[in-house]
A protein has these predicted regions:
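Bacterial N-terminal signal peptides that target proteins for export
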Residues: 1-7
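Short, solvent-exposed recognition patches
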Residues: 22-109
Length: 156
């Protein structure tokens, strides 16, 4: 009986950890760097994972993608106020947008480039960062990644 309970608990924990079952996929036609994975462990137990991969689209747009899943991202809520930092902050700006039907925040910093943060699930956040991409290029790249991540999730 104890084994059945333990097995049921393990299956439930595995299913919960695979809520989005995401990884940063290899995209056909893109140059995809190696997937770097960091498990987020603490004294209190496993807290999630951090995945990183560099991409270059077929059009030559280079960006870094980061997928964080676990205890940290579930506390993240998109800000309700957006705007521009003005001259004193170096011209940074932030804007709420929608990417593939998900709430997102697009941040622009003149020296660092663009950062697009998309909340895909209760426990998962996808971030794309690029020094050279424009808004449309980064948004299209995010949409492509999200579509592929969701397709892989549906296959499982």
């Amino acid at each position: 009986m104890f084994r059945k309970i333990l097995l049921a608990a393990a299956i439930a924990a595995l299913a919960a950890s695979q809520a989005f079952a995401a990884t940063l996929p290899e995209v056909e036609g893109w140059a995809c760097g190696p997937l770097r994975e960091t498990q987020l462990d603490a004294v209190s137990g496993h807290q999630g994972q951090w995945l990183e991969r560099e991409y270059r689209t077929a059009n030559g747009v280079k960006f870094l993608a980061v997928w964080m899943e676990g205890a940290g991202p579930k506390l993240w809520k998109p800000v309700t106020e957006v705007g521009e930092g003005g001259e004193t902050s170096g011209g940074e700006s932030a804007e709420k947008i929608s990417v593939a039907g998900h709430g997102a925040m697009l941040e622009s910093r003149p020296v660092l480039g663009l950062s697009l943060v998309v909340k895909l699930s209760k426990d998962g956040v996808l971030t794309l960062e690029s020094q050279s991409a424009d808004r449309d290029e980064l948004t299209r790249a995010a949409e492509t990644l999200i579509e592929q991540m969701e397709a892989e999730k549906a296959e499982k």
